[in-house]
């Protein structure tokens, strides 16, 4: 049986669970595959991707900080990827790269189906404006978010994301220093990498951001999610959710694009959550 070659590219990448997830999906679905992880800095991404193709690579996932760089290498793009301006799934089609973004679908499926949240009518705060934020923002809007406020330490990037989303009546950008003046939100999504540079003793957000039904969601998982989730628990947020479920769901979407069949995510999520999942409240 021929073995298909896939990979995940990121920087850093040693923490990635994607190889394990896709290997388990392949075993479940009877698909022979070889899935590797490559630690690649942004300036070396294009060359590394060309080498991967030369060695038989036919599909790849892309994580931070390469999602916008992946967008640039694509000859064709899905509507979701084009709207996001970021790519997390690459497929080799007729000798060129086709780009897709499954992050938003993975997040919404995890929140609505696994955690039972109804996103319709919620006011959302999105922290961050990089590749991770770009991937999930369109899907959150499509899921019925009433208003989205984007806050980023570099306000220019928040403005760029607002412009790309093209919904000025629903989406606005504010400064990080304005957080205490924004009112409360039913959904707070951390799409930053702040968990890699902060600890639970120093990370904090204004308590005024919360109401009685707020869901605090970190797109990170494991140690990178600890500071944000620790804050959310400390201020008694109603729902506290890490990014592990989103990771598994977006991986299943990528697997389906490559192999034409969507695996069952619950068995994989259950095992990984027992090992890596942060304590949650949902």
Curated annotation (Swiss-Prot):
GO biological process: amino acid biosynthetic process; aromatic amino acid family biosynthetic process; chorismate biosynthetic process; shikimate metabolic process
E.C. numbers: 1.1.1.25
Name of protein: Shikimate dehydrogenase (NADP(+))
Record: residues binding shikimate: 16-18, 63, 88, 103
InterPro entries: Aminoacid_DH-like_N_sf (IPR046346), NAD(P)-bd_dom_sf (IPR036291), SDH_C (IPR041121), Shikimate_DH (IPR011342), Shikimate_DH-bd_N (IPR013708), Shikimate_DH_fam (IPR022893), Shikm_DH/Glu-tRNA_Rdtase (IPR006151)
Keywords: Amino-acid biosynthesis, Aromatic amino acid biosynthesis, NADP, Oxidoreductase
Subunit structure: Homodimer.
UniProt entry tagged with the keyword Transcription regulation: no
Catalysis: reaction(s): shikimate + NADP(+) = 3-dehydroshikimate + NADPH + H(+)
Lineage: Bacteria, Pseudomonadati, Pseudomonadota, Gammaproteobacteria, Lysobacterales
Cellular component aspect of the GO annotation: cytosol
Gene Ontology molecular function, alphabetical: NADP binding; shikimate 3-dehydrogenase (NADP+) activity
Pathway(s): Metabolic intermediate biosynthesis; chorismate biosynthesis; chorismate from D-erythrose 4-phosphate and phosphoenolpyruvate: step 4/7
Binding sites annotated in the UniProt record for NADP(+): 128-132, 243
Family classification: Belongs to the shikimate dehydrogenase family.
Active-site residues, record numbering mapped to chain: 67 (proton acceptor)
Class of enzymatic activity (EC top level): oxidoreductase
Task performed by this protein: Involved in the biosynthesis of the chorismate, which leads to the biosynthesis of aromatic amino acids. Catalyzes the reversible NADPH linked reduction of 3-dehydroshikimate (DHSA) to yield shikimate (SA).
Superkingdom of this protein's organism: Bacteria
């Amino acid at each position: 049986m021929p073995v298909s070659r896939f990979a995940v590219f990121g920087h850093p990448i040693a923490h990635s669970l994607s190889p394990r997830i896709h290997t388990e999906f392949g075993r479940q679905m009877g698909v022979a595959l070889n899935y590797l992880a490559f630690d690649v800095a942004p300036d070396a991404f294009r060359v590394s991707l060309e080498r991967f193709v030369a060695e038989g690579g036919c599909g790849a996932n892309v994580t931070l900080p390469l999602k916008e760089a992946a967008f640039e290498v694509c000859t064709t793009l899905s509507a979701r990827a084009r709207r996001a301006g970021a790519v997390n799934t690459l497929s080799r089609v007729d000798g060129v790269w086709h780009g897709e973004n499954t992050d938003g679908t993975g997040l919404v499926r995890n929140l609505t189906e696994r955690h039972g949240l109804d996103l319709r009518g919620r006011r959302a705060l999105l922290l961050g404006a990089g590749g991770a934020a770009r991937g999930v923002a369109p899907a959150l809007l499509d899921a019925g978010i009433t208003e989205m406020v984007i806050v980023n330490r570099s306000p220019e990037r928040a403005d760029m994301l607002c412009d790309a989303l093209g919904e000025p009546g629903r989406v606005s950008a504010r400064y990080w220093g304005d957080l205490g003046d924004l009112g409360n939100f039913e959904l707070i999504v951390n799409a930053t990498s702040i968990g890699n540079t902060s600890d639970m003793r120093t990370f904090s957000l204004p308590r005024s951001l919360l109401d009685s039904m707020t869901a605090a969601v970190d797109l990170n998982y494991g140690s990178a999610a600890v500071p944000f989730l620790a804050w959310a628990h400390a201020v008694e947020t109603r729902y506290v959710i890490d990014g592990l479920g989103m990771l598994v769901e977006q991986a299943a979407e990528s697997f389906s694009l490559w192999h034409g069949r969507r695996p069952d995510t619950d068995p994989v999520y259950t095992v990984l959550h027992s090992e890596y999942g942060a304590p949650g409240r949902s």
